[in-house]
From Swiss-Prot:
It comes from the Eukaryota. This is ATP-dependent Clp protease proteolytic subunit. It is found in: Plastid, Chloroplast stroma. The active site is at S101 (nucleophile), H126. It catalyses: Hydrolysis of proteins to small peptides in the presence of ATP and magnesium. alpha-casein is the usual test substrate. In the absence of ATP, only oligopeptides shorter than five residues are hydrolyzed (such as succinyl-Leu-Tyr-|-NHMec, and Leu-Tyr-Leu-|-Tyr-Trp, in which cleavage of the -Tyr-|-Leu- and -Tyr-|-Trp bonds also occurs). InterPro entries: ClpP (IPR001907), ClpP/crotonase-like_dom_sf (IPR029045), ClpP/TepA (IPR023562), ClpP_His_AS (IPR033135), ClpP_Ser_AS (IPR018215). HAMAP family: ClpP. It holds the Pfam family CLP_protease. One of its GO terms (biological process) is protein quality control for misfolded or incompletely synthesized proteins.
Length: 216
């Protein structure tokens, strides 16, 4: 029997007593977002809308985006990436599980020095694809040209943010490249592997958010 979205007690600032609210609503109040499904229009609008709202509410506090996704639509993923570069707060990107295809592109889009992968996470990058077989010849040629432009743009972003030469990234994207957290750090996709933070903070305060859950 599915349990649905868990509810947790949360005291809204100004209220005397805690009320039961959806877990995700509590996390949103703590500036913590989740990308845990295929990247399509609905989840893209959801995440980008929250990023804009949180930026308006407080432009100084960081936003945390947890990622566990196999990727999805190219344009939708680029919309999330562009929003991350536009909003005022720094955005932590944290990979747990897997960040594949466009999800790895979003992981890459976090604030430099604030891109994190959990120790057993997997990251995969490859080139964008399109369903050519559905198009007639003129449409096929136009789609190939557009896809080539998008591929070059994505490759340039990977090269710029990882520090790898353009040709290296281009060759790697010819196939599915799976990386461990340590390999992704060496490649430049992330800056920190989670166990490094645990080792550093094991005898001090919580690793992520010292002020988190203060109203629970």
């Amino acid at each position: 029997m599915p349990i649905g979205v868990p509810k947790v007690p949360y005291r809204i600032p100004g209220d005397e007593e805690a009320t039961w609210v959806d877990l995700y609503n509590v996390m949103y109040r703590e500036r913590t977002l989740f990308l845990g499904q295929e990247i399509r229009c609905e989840i893209t609008n959801h995440i980008t809308g929250l990023m804009v709202y949180l930026s308006i509410e407080d432009g100084n506090s960081d936003i945390f985006l947890f990622i566990n996704s196999l990727g999805g639509w190219l344009i939708s993923g680029m919309a999330i990436f562009d929003t991350m570069q536009t909003v005022t707060p720094d955005i932590y990107t944290i990979c747990l599980g897997i960040a594949a295809s466009m999800a790895s592109f979003i992981l890459l889009g976090g604030e430099p020095t604030k891109r994190i992968a959990f120790p057993h996470a997997r990251i995969m990058l490859h080139q964008p694809a399109s369903a050519y077989y559905r198009a007639r010849t003129p449409e096929f040629l136009l789609e190939v040209e557009e896809l080539h432009k998008v591929r070059e743009m994505i490759t340039r972003v990977y090269a710029l943010r990882t520090g790898k030469p353009f040709w290296v990234v281009s060759e790697d994207m010819e196939r599915d490249v799976f990386m461990s957290a340590d390999e992704a750090k060496a490649y430049g996709l992330v800056d920190i592997v989670g166990d490094e933070m645990i080792d550093e903070h094991c005898d001090t305060d919580p690793v992520w958010f010292p002020e988190m859950f203060k109203d629970w």
